[in-house]
């Protein structure tokens, strides 16, 4: 994403269709250029939204002055990875830093791409990621911003989803399931596994789900090409 550059809209949000609901700004953690800020403002004026998006296995990923070295992150955010309470407090600080960035640049929220384990997404300390998400939700509610989670498709990835509490699942605006190459039967099996993971909130989770697809790479793409030929 480069923003508006002359007459070209190739790398601009405003080059997207007017019907676009929202866009996740992959690997954007602030420091927007003048061109990006102008593009974002015009994009939002059309009724569309844009949210920050990155992977964060560890507390402080991408927002820690000095880089992503473990020792640097632990020192800056003030936590011991073996001490649960210090991790919870640091996760809340990290969430507030994301909120501050969204407010500074008038970004519409945060899309948490959940694909990595670490000091933030920790299966042995589920209170940490859930405190992080709860803080984001509470702060975003004050300004009408969005909270989204990306989770890879495939039953083997659902351990990330299972770490999220039912309260966290219900608090999300959207869940984007990255099911790029699954065919019809694979999707059926996957969402049956989703149901088993959090049966009490399955209906609500499905109501806020975005299911990704790459038809060109899907295992059953031949069904579509055969229909086109007939």
Model-derived regions: residue spans:
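Secreted glycan hydrolases and related glycan-binding modules that recognize and/or cleave
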Residues: 1-230
């Amino acid at each position: 994403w480069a923003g508006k550059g002359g007459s070209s809209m190739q790398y601009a949000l405003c080059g997207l269709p007017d019907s676009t609901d929202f866009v996740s700004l992959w690997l954007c953690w602030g420091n927007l250029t003048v061109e990006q800020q102008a593009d974002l403002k015009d994009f939002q004026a059309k009724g569309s939204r844009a949210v920050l998006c990155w992977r964060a296995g560890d507390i402080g990923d991408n927002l820690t002055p000095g880089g992503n070295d473990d020792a640097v992150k632990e020192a800056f955010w003030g936590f011991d990875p073996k001490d649960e309470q210090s991790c919870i407090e640091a996760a809340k600080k990290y969430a507030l830093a994301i909120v501050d960035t969204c407010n500074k640049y008038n970004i519409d929220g945060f899309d948490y791409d959940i694909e990595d384990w670490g000091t933030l997404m920790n299966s042995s300390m589920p209170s940490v990621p859930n405190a992080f998400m709860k803080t984001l939700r509470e702060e975003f509610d004050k300004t009408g911003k969005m909270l989204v989670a990306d989770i890879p498709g495939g039953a083997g990835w659902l351990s990330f989803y299972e770490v999220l509490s039912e309260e966290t699942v219900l608090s999300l605006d959207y869940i984007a399931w990255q099911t790029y190459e699954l065919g019809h039967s694979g999707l059926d099996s996957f969402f049956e596994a989703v149901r088993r993971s959090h049966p009490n909130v399955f209906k609500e989770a499905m109501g806020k789900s975005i299911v990704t697809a790459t038809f060109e790479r899907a295992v059953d793409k031949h069904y579509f090409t055969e229909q086109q030929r007939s």
